[in-house]
Amino acid sequence: MLRGLPEATVIRDPSDWAPFLRDESHVRGVAPLAVVKPHGPSALRELVRRAKAEGFGLVPRGAGTGKAGGCVPTDRTVVVDFSAWPGEIVVSPQDLCLHAPASALLRDVKAAAETHRLFYPPDPNSWESCALGGTLATNAGGPNACKYGMTRHWVLSLDALLEDGEIHTFGISSVKANAGPALGQLFIGSEGIFGFILGATLRLTPLPREFVTLLLPVKHWEDLLDLPGRLCGAGFLPSAFEFFDPAVLAELRAHGPDEARRLPGEALAILEFDERGCTSESFLEGLLDLLGPVADGLEVAADVRQRQGIWAVRRMTSVFLQERHPGKVSEDIVVPRSRLREFFEGLDQLRIPAVTYGHLGDGNLHVNLLAAGATEPAHLDHQLVELFRLALSLGGTLSGEHGIGLAKRDAFLALSDPAHLHTLRALKQALDPQNIFNPGKVI
């Protein structure tokens, strides 16, 4: 299989394929035909040619940190592992941008920007280990999306492999580019079904010079639900607004690390602000006035060490719950800030055994069904569909940042607007008529 492929390492031994059959979701893939690590464009050109001639598909893979099964192999596919794709991170401070290959780790992208006192905001929970290409293909989010938006808001241009086997660049290194539709945006969040992302030019902004990190414990957890809308309505836009519901907080206190065992409240929020003046007394006084009695237990991180400790607990929550409940299923639905209370009231009425934490500030909630592994599959599917229907009924969506992949494909197809699906299929047919790019995913 794939003999004589130029500029590539081909892994043919099935005993070496295990790491490539999964990501961080519950989805498991089938054995691929091979795993290929391309080192240059001639490898991709030949891969595309052979895929079209021999009738197999190509599955892109970055660091394997996805949450929806988007990078796992399906029938008659070759995994294309971009971890060794060449390229350097090049920062242009004058243009407030940088260019990086898909193989670059997001932590290195962010660090390169920060050496010039610049900031690349997207910060998914896996930011220290995920690859840039994967964050582009899934339109990754994270806590900072509350203020700064998703990955797609920070992409100026994109390098993509198309079905002709060539690498094409869409966009320029400027915030202004209006010569027709922004075709590069089609690839962001497409999970590789239109073509493969090989690199991108990313927009940067000056690095925030001030931070204030706040712990907000509450005696009655419903008191948190109106706060995102109240804060935004009063002109307080946090750069992050995270939360733990009572069940998650209880698990952390009972079984988590020492930092988690000391967390106060029935439920808890983490708020962070990074605007100029946010550390001033007047800013904090205005915030306290707005919060009112809810802020009785408010704690301000005293220094960088305490701030890092707070965020360490938040960042480890997903792994902690996975270790405690190996069969759990984690969803990432979204509802508008103004309808958070309605969502949780509806969730109670559905009687779905779930715990929640995540990005309260932008309505992106990680709803975890801890007993999913012990639940009859048909009943679990019913619970998930009911959860998705609830989010959709409130003007939300079934995925805020993880994507569709294989994990949510059936629900996505069942619940989406037919016109939406028709348009996606038309785009797929136009850009990938032989269905070689990540077949079986999303649609």
Where are these regions (language model features)?
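N-terminal flexible segment immediately upstream of the FAD-binding catalytic core
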Residues: M1-R49, T65-L96, N125, V248-D258, ...
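C-terminal substrate-recognition/cap domain of FAD-linked oxidoreductases
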Residues: R12-W17, L21-D23, P206, V212-E386, ...
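Short acidic/histidine-rich active-site segments
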Residues: T397-I404, P439-G440
